[in-house]
Amino acid sequence: RCRTTRLRLGQALALGCGVLLAGCGDGPGGDGIGSAIFSEVRVIGGRGNGPGRFVKPRSVAVDRDDNVYVCDMTGRIQKFDPDGNYLLQWQMPEIERGRPKGMALDHEGNIVVVEPHYSRINHFTPEGKLVSQWGVHGREKGQLSFPRAVAIAPDGAAYVSEFQVVERLQKFAPARESVQVEIRGAGHGPREFNRAEGLSLDDAGNLYVADSCNHRVQVFDGDGAFLREHGGPGAARGEFSYPYDVRVDEQGRQYVCEFGNSRVTVLDADDQVLEVIGGAGSAPGRFNNPWSLALDSRGNLYVADSQNHRVQKLIRREPASEFQLSSSPN
């Protein structure tokens, strides 16, 4: 809880994972989803417990080979190839207290998964082998209390956001032996948080925080100095309703996933809105309480469309030669 309180379908592309292609041709920029940036949508999954199906997916990540990892409410991590074909899965070690939420790629190519209810961070190989686990429960500096998101810098430093017991952002040194930055405080002012749900690093090392219950994005430099904020509660352009995640590409474009408005807002490096994608619904290109975002090396955007029990892949219009993802692993 917060403290304050006509789209044409193409043929199926894969087997049991249910990948569907949505053609785009009648919206702004010639796009049926109303996007000048993305040309089409691929729908991965659907409700179910079998391979390639999901129960409320809440986190998504992409590795160096553009394979996709999805975490859902069953506590599974499922891996798909870049075309959405199911490859493998593994189960989190414990789910009795609560389910995992929050994923990233670390500097060694491992998949990082956050367990809020266990106050710990896990690093898995792309095949699902647990290689590292860290975090000590508590409110003190260097401890973790209900962590929600993680971002890993190129040098291995880890940014972690927490909420509920303590509203906080910490930057852990690469070896986790010390905390280099702690920003702590519940509230609505700069450097204060109300359920920070998503984190992303840009190419310059600046950190973007989806401050969900404050309905805004805050931006800090790598040392925790406040740079700016944008947003505010609402449904107009430039306003947000419970932004649960944010991603930044090499051009500085920001992609903000709004749980409340069931849409993705795209902004430029100056925080000006470029376009708004989606809206509530179950058709391809529409969302129902999306939770998480990920970008691949071609600039394609993955959306964990939670209440529709699927992941949507928005295919970028630009050829790969014109777009390169940031070297940051997030």
Residues covered by each model-derived region:
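Eukaryotic scaffold repeat domains enriched in small/polar residues
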Residues: C24-N330
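Bacterial N-terminal signal peptides
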Residues: G10-A22
